[in-house]
UniProtKB/Swiss-Prot annotation:
SUPFAM superfamilies: EGF/Laminin (SSF57196), Integrin beta tail domain (SSF69687), Integrin domains (SSF69179), Plexin repeat (SSF103575), vWA-like (SSF53300). Belongs to the integrin beta chain family. This is Integrin beta pat-3. It comes from Caenorhabditis elegans. The lineage of its organism: Eukaryota, Metazoa, Ecdysozoa, Nematoda, Chromadorea. Residues 20-737 are extracellular.
Length: 809
């Protein structure tokens, strides 16, 4: 074995990510994940010890210096940087570091041939030592490479009920071919054989004596639970002979007792002959279903299966009548613990059942193959399913979350591009190398401190052994570091800078001697009510009096007899405590002069509400908290604007001054002369309106001449006077051309009539031409009769005498 490689990694010195070169070279690396910031000072004072501190968070450290928190109320539990900043000597800081040390790291090798003394190495490294503190993580790489000619032990478990008679014969004939085919996969191959029927109990078998002796239609052997027929060997001729010699039997119900056989094949390691460093294969061949835990109760068997070996000298399972069938959970655990691989070779009608069984066995290597009715395809099936199992690697471990240890995996598998969360890689051929990034995390502490983790591929007895020590305790808590009968603790013991009182004394420095009063009784004096926490959970009870915890921000202080008050939990305005216009005192704001309100957000002065006319909120509202709250207008709508100067439905000054402008400048509009004289202003006629920003432009149409007139006004709210400028000239529309419109209409009508006549003429011409063309076509196609004219009459008429008899002889 080459010398061990040692790699020590401290959490404060190493980065988070693994370098890319690690994936390319396959070198083993270890990384401690960087610490994150955490408010360690919030550790509960009810359990304020060094070990509780380092277990609180990975970034928490403890200052064990005596009297460290005497002058200033600094927290002993804080980050290392904060403790040093507050003056804690480095030698007194308890901050255990996570480290990783690789103790065995042999190279991957293919030396697994039969004649080789050395065993193949498929996983790297082989052993490491990790010290990990609570709530921290450490990462390392595990490399796997499938070796050439890795040893394979194949144990064939066959259902020898009567329906499998032809299958037994075919297996006997194919024994040599099976061994020959498997040796093309690996030269280091051994073969074993066992058989099973069912429990020899009713209702699983026929209770009649003659049927118990020979349950088959033709003579056959008595039923049995399981029989080990042949141990693992390279002698294939013996395998063929043992299969041929094995006797067929039978049972009554359809399911078989195959689970008993699997458990015994796994439990009887020496009898079967399993090698420690070999791929253990069990081929489970049947044409029926299976019995499992609970079925034995039908026959009165209630004792659970213990999962241990019970074979006699002849290889028979001796507890078949005493123990129930194994549960699927027991089957899964034994396959996982023994690092075995199972191939279920079943007939087509049972494929779905055994596929469900295979899926119920997580993190173990199992597969299902369809067996021909006479098992003629058994060789191809085993070869195919073996390759399927061997080409898939599942990384498994024995980490127990309840013990505070958690392992997670990431890998690029064979694509080498994307690192993904998985513990499974597929398509692994002989010589292929895959790497897994493993993260070990401690989530909490238990009484146990030392653990042995085993990480390795499912179905292989090769593992990485990780010896783990969880750093849940501080060195200053060791017995040889405790200062007993310390003067600083008034005779108590000083542990990590904190006094541990004895002899009835209590208090921070054991200075309280209250005969007849327990610490619990003193703690009751530090509660505001019976239901309250001690010092409201924000301080410690010292001799029956509360000492409030310090805050990380020195400007924030907790106070009060029971630490019920502070200066940072008051109402805020714009995210500012008391709007920065007062002081926070025990949850209430004490406002500075000139300010009021729950959060001192309201000025007492109403200056901010004064409008230009000197009225508060323009006389249309009230000033509340420095802002105008407007009243409703006479029509029920609310005034608006910063000073309530806007009335959405009130008439504007433009509309109000319109009639006065019309009557004064042009003597038009609805006002008579008397009403016009009563207008509150006199217009100022100008050629062009002045360009003043503070004036409001107005324009209206005079109904008398349909001309638009313009004027500007300025209203002085202070004096309630208006100044109005009006432009002398109106903008009148041009006169309507009546004659042109009439002539245009007449011309349009005439032209339209002419166009209609022309259109009518065009249509008639086209129609006549069509009729004439039709007539010519009919004339040319006509065929006239050549007889006489039917209306022609000749000029002469001949009459014959009807009584004329002719000439006499």
């Amino acid at each position: 074995m080459p010398p061990s490689t040692s790699l020590l990694l401290l959490a404060a010195l190493l980065p988070f990510a693994l370098p890319a070169s690690d994936w390319k070279t396959g070198e083993v690396t270890g990384k401690v994940v960087e610490k994150s910031e955490f408010p360690c000072y919030s550790l509960s004072r009810d359990n304020y010890t060094c070990s509780a501190c380092i277990q609180y968070h990975e970034s928490c450290a403890w200052c064990g210096a005596p009297m460290f928190d005497e002058k200033k109320p600094y927290a002993r539990c804080d980050s290392r940087a904060k403790l040093m900043e507050h003056g804690c000597p480095n030698s007194y800081i308890e901050d255990p570091a996570t480290k990783l040390d690789i103790t065995e790291d042999s190279k991957l090798s293919d030396q697994g041939q039969v004649e080789s003394e050395e065993e193949a190495v498929q996983i790297k490294p082989q052993e490491m030592y990790v010290e990990i503190r609570p709530k921290s993580r450490v990462r390392f790489n595990v490399t796997y490479r499938q070796a050439v000619d890795y040893p394979v032990d194949l144990y064939y478990l066959m259902d020898l009920s009567y329906s499998m008679k032809d299958d037994k014969q075919k297996l006997s004939e194919l024994g040599d071919l099976l061994a020959e085919r498997m040796r093309t996969v690996t030269k280091n191959f051994r073969l074993g054989f066992g058989s099973f029927i069912d429990k020899k109990l009713m209702p699983f078998i026929d209770p009649r004596i003659e049927k118990q002796l020979s349950p088959c239609p033709t003579p056959c052997a008595e039923p049995y639970g399981f029989k080990h027929q042949m141990s693992l060997t390279t002698n294939t001729a013996k395998f063929k002979a043992e299969v041929d010699k094995a006797e067929i039997s039978g049972n009554l119900d359809a399911p078989e007792g195959g689970f008993d056989a699997v458990v015994q094949a796994l439990a009887c390691n020496k009898t079967i002959g399993w090698r420690e460093r070999a791929r253990k294969m069990i081929v489970f061949s049947t044409d029926a279903g299976f019995h499992f835990a609970g079925d034995g109760r039908l026959a009165g068997v209630v004792e659970p299966n213990d999962g241990t070996c019970h074979l006699d000298r002849e290889g028979y399972y001796t507890e078949t009548l005493n123990q129930d069938y194994p549960s699927i959970a027991l089957l899964h655990q034994m396959i996982k613990d023994r690092k075995a691989n199972v191939i279920f070779a079943v007939t087509k009608n049972n494929q779905d059942l055994y596929t469900q069984l295979s899926n119920a066995l997580p993190d173990v290597s199992s597969s299902v193959g369809v067996l021909a009715n006479d098992s003629r395809n058994i060789v191809d099936l085993i070869e195919k399913e073996y390759l399927k199992i061997s080409e898939k690697i599942i990384m498994v471990d024995n980490a127990n979350a309840s013990e505070g240890l958690k392992l997670t995996y990431r890998s690029m598998c064979l694509d080498g591009t994307t690192l993904k969360d998985t513990n499974v890689c597929e398509g692994i051929r002989v010589g292929d190398e895959v790497q897994f990034e493993v993260t070990l995390e401690n989530t909490h502490c238990i009484d146990k401190r030392d653990f042995v983790l085993r990480i390795g591929p499912s179905g292989l007895d090769e593992t990485l052994i990780v010896n783990v020590k969880v750093l849940c305790d501080c060195d200053c808590e060791r017995q040889d570091r405790i200062v007993t009968n310390s003067a600083d603790c008034n005779g108590g013991d000083m542990v990590c800078g904190v006094c541990r009182c004895k002899g009835g004394n209590v208090g921070k420095y054991c200075e309280c001697n209250r005969p007849g009063m327990s610490t619990a009784a003193l703690n009751e004096k530090c509660k505001r009510t019976n239901e309250s926490a001690i010092c409201e959970g924000r301080g410690v009870c010292n001799c029956g009096r509360c000492e409030c915890n310090p805050r990380a921000n020195p400007e924030e202080q907790i106070s009060g007899e029971f630490c019920e008050c502070d200066n940072f939990n008051c109402p805020r305005h714009d995210r500012k405590i008391c709007a920065e216009h007062g002081e926070c005192n025990c949850g209430k704001c004490i406002c500075a002069p000139g300010w009021t309100g729950r959060a001192c957000e309201c000025p007492i002065s109403t200056d901010s509400c004064l409008s230009a006319n000197g009225k508060i909120c323009n006389g249309k509202g009230e000033c509340i908290c420095g802002r105008c709250r407007c009243f409703d207008s006479p029509d029920g709508n609310r005034y608006s604007g910063a000073k309530c100067e806007i009335c959405p439905t009130c008439p504007t000054k433009c509309v109000e001054y319109k009639n006065c402008v019309m009557c004064q400048q042009w003597q038009t509009g609805p006002l008579n002369e008397t009403a016009c004289d009563q207008c509150e202003f006199k217009v100022i006629p100008v050629e062009e309106l002045p360009n003043l920003n503070e004036t409001t432009p107005c324009q209206f149409v005079d109904p008398a001449d349909d001309c638009t007139f313009y004027y500007l006004y300025y209203y002085d709210e202070a004096t309630d006077n208006a100044t109005v400028w009006v432009r002398k000239h109106k903008d009148c529309p041009p006169p309507v051309p009546v004659l042109a419109i009439v002539l245009g209409v007449i011309a349009g009508i005439v032209i339209l009539g002419i166009l209609l006549l022309l259109l009518w003429k065009l249509l008639t011409v086209l129609h006549d031409r069509s009729e004439y063309a039709t007539f010519n076509n009919e004339r040319l196609m006509a065929k006239w009769d050549t007889n006489e004219n039917p209306i022609y009459k000749q000029a002469t008429t001949t009459f014959k005498n009807p009584v004329y008899a002719g000439k006499a002889n």
